[in-house]
């Protein structure tokens, strides 16, 4: 690592750890999302093959988020996330099983109470071609919330024709409609806090073929992360989001929303083995 880059890395680490220590108290809770890009269990069939050092680096990145609760995406199975948890004492997890090799779930510290969750199948609007959501009930201090973790349909290189791309947009819109129904049903309970976090595979500002419209147009939904930029391509808006209903958003501390830049924590070649996404976190008051 060049001397200048190493100096910047050290400066970032010191400042970030100071920020995390300030958050590590009972008056706030840090909630986020992290797509770990094909996190496998280490066998020969893994799509993205990682070394033990790579699993350690993933744990380092998670630790640096300071998250009390982290939505996690693209996890092959329980064994895969346990490879990371070896290096994260004090964390527990819950994981779905109907996302094939890309399951979603939640990672959380002992600082938070998290009840046993369940997969929310209505988000998988096209059966096993989609991933269901994962819902948990959480609380810390005087803040209790219902949270869903999602990984919506992507529009990728595999969608190689105009027809396939149009179909992917339609599929994601269906999923967003299911999220709107869920958010509305939770919000109908007076004072109930609801949060959706995960990889939405789209950004709020999209003008052509937008797919998040059903949530954006809701007067009871706030995209807390809509102004964040991609850590990989800074000119792009991010697709990893934390979304809250108005009750939960009233607890939001806007200065705490940020992307955790992996390439400032690790050399580039190591950062690339962690994920093609960076964690996104937000902070809420628990008072």
Task: Explain the meaning of each model-derived region.
Residues 1-7:
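Bacterial N-terminal signal peptides that target proteins for export
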Residues 7-16:
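Bacterial N-terminal signal peptides
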Residues 19, 181-194, 201-287:
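Metal-dependent phosphoester-hydrolase catalytic domains
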Residues 19-88, 92, 98-101, 176-180, ...:
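N-terminal, active-site-proximal structural segment of metallo-dependent hydrolase catalytic domains
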Residues 37, 76, 151-153, 200-203:
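Catalytic metal-binding/acid-base residues of hydrolase active sites
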Residues 43-49, 66-72, 94, 123-125, ...:
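Second-shell loop/turn segments in exported
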Residues 69, 74-153:
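Structured beta-strand-rich core segments of catalytic domains in phosphoester-bond hydrolases
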Residues 143, 149-168:
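Active-site His/acidic residue clusters
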């Amino acid at each position: 690592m060049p001397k200048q880059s190493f100096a910047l890395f050290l400066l970032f680490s010191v400042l970030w750890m100071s920020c995390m220590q300030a958050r590590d108290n009972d008056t706030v809770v840090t909630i986020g999302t992290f797509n770990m890009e094909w996190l496998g269990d280490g066998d020969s069939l893994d799509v993205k093959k990682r070394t033990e050092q790579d699993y350690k680096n993933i744990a380092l990145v998670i630790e640096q988020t300071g998250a009390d609760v982290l939505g996690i995406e693209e996890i092959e199975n329980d064994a895969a996330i346990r490879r990371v948890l070896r290096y994260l004492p004090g964390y527990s997890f819950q994981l779905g099983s109907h996302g094939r090799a890309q399951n979603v779930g939640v990672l959380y510290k002992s600082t938070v109470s998290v009840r046993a969750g369940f997969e929310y199948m209505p988000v998988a609007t096209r059966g096993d071609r989609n991933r269901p959501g994962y819902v948990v009930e959480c609380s810390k201090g005087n803040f209790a919330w219902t949270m869903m973790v999602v990984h919506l349909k992507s529009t990728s290189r595999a969608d190689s024709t105009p027809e396939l791309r149009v179909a992917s947009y339609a599929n994601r819109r269906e999923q967003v409609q299911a999220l709107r129904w869920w958010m509305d049903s939770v919000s109908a309970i007076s004072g109930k806090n609801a949060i959706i976090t995960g990889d939405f595979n789209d950004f709020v500002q999209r003008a052509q073929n937008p797919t998040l419209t059903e949530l954006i147009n809701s007067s009871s939904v706030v995209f807390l992360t809509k102004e964040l930029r991609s850590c990989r391509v800074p000119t792009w808006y991010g697709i990893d989001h934390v979304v809250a209903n108005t009750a939960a958003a009233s607890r939001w501390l806007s200065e705490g929303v940020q992307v955790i830049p992996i390439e400032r924590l690790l050399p580039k070649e190591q950062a690339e083995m962690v994920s093609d996404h960076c964690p996104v976190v937000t902070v809420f008051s628990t008072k």
